[in-house]
Amino acid sequence: MHRKVKQVLRSYRIFNKNCKVVVAVSGGKDSTALLHILHSLFSSRKDVELIALSIDEGIEDYRPLTIDASRSVAKRLDVPLVVKSFQDLYKITSDQMAAQNHAQAPCTFCGVLRKSLLNRTARELGADALATGHNLDDEAQTVLLNYIKGDIDRLYRLRPSRELNGMVPRIKPLRRVPEKEMAIYAITHDLPLGHGSCPHIPRAIRLEVKNMLNDLEFKHPGTKYSIMRGFDRILQLRPPGESFQPIPCSKCGEPSSDGICQCCRLLDQVTQG
């Protein structure tokens, strides 16, 4: 496990210097395991600072349990935990958005808002990198999902983070580790295995992609690794596009591609009901 993570970390070149890394922790097995792994690798280094960050989207009977789990693991590792909520910043919760029954799945709204809040908070904390617990299964699902949608631009955004105005570089140390290995690590290190699934997941196409991929992996072992190997090769075919830089959103000041960030666009939809 540590060997795979170290290989990925070397490619990011983040930990070669004094650095502050914010770790997005949801309270599930992957994110708490990531925090545990990074702590075990770097706790002896005085030049590396870890901060755990949890987002409260406002999902009743689900998120409070996972935040408690995050708080427990962070306390055990003596890592500071910061909690930010949708309600405080956006004045609306994920449950409230889901109740409006938009054509888009609740996961679309929740994912965009959570990503923006993670980046905003990591930047305010002065982070050099934002680490997320996406494992091999998650990454393969995302790649396949974007193939299905024909969203090539979004595919290329999955490449290793670059220095972009207002954006904290994202790193995914677990991108080569299968979900099953993460579960084993969590069990053997007494970490949370999870608190069930988010109640809004059944309305997301990602669940269908996940089930399809698991079926393919069962019939053809190595499918998920193959998808990621192919994707990594595709990334090499397109120039990195270092000339592109986000511009501040005219509404909130957060990074955007055209002057209005996706977060504000979605919040406008919610406001208009």
Could you describe each region identified by the protein language model?
Residues 105, 225, 247, 259-262:
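Cys/His-enriched microdomains
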Residues 257-259, 270-273:
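Short, non-ligating residues that shape and space the ligands of small metal-coordination modules
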Residues 1, 256, 268:
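Cys/His-rich microdomains that often coordinate metals
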Residues 124, 137-218, 223:
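Catalytic subdomain that performs nucleotidyl-dependent activation
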Residues 106-119, 156-165, 217-233:
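Short, basic, helix/turn surface patches
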Residues 235-245, 251-256:
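Short, flexible, mixed-charge glycine/proline-rich loop motifs
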Residues 1, 248-252, 261-264:
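Short cysteine-rich clusters marking metal-coordination/redox-active sites
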Residues 1-145, 149-156, 176-189, 261:
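ATP-dependent adenylation/nucleotidyltransferase module used to activate substrates
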